[in-house]
Amino acid sequence: MKRQRTRRGLGGSAIAAVMVLTLAACHSTPAATSIHIDLNCVYNGVPGPEPVPDQPGSITVTADSPRWATEGSVIPVVRNSTYTDVDLPISGEVFAFLDVEGGTWNGRIVNNLPALDPATDATVDITESAPGHVAIGVAEVWVVKFVVNRPVSFMCTPTSTPPALADVQVRKNPS
């Protein structure tokens, strides 16, 4: 398992994160007990491999104490010079508020894409840029709702084996 690392951010523009609900195949933590925020594949809005040290615009994760996310918790994602992977325990439904800025994130989202199609949900600015891929508009705040006890994966590794489809809702924060 990767070492948990959380710390208070010192500011800077937030950028998109790729979020993965931890799966037993990759981590010893049971899938229903943590959200894995995978920062290996996005820097400066561009997918890239791990590790990419000292890349301007690469990101780390901060979380307030207590170090678990419950319903309504805010998980800030800020610019930093190093990559960090963080496993956060979860309870119930988790809403992660991501301030997305600085480019377009082209990442692979394994979920029910039709439910997130702008043609059927005007509150979501998501367009399919390639089969199984989406482009998410930036400079907006998004709410990502994870429903626990269902395998959910946000990933951008082309060779990843996707888990079963699950309920994921992405909505623009109205405030």
Whereabouts are the PLM-identified features?
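Secretory targeting and sorting signals
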Residues: M1-T29
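Primarily mature extracellular domains of secreted and cell-surface proteins
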Residues: P30-S175
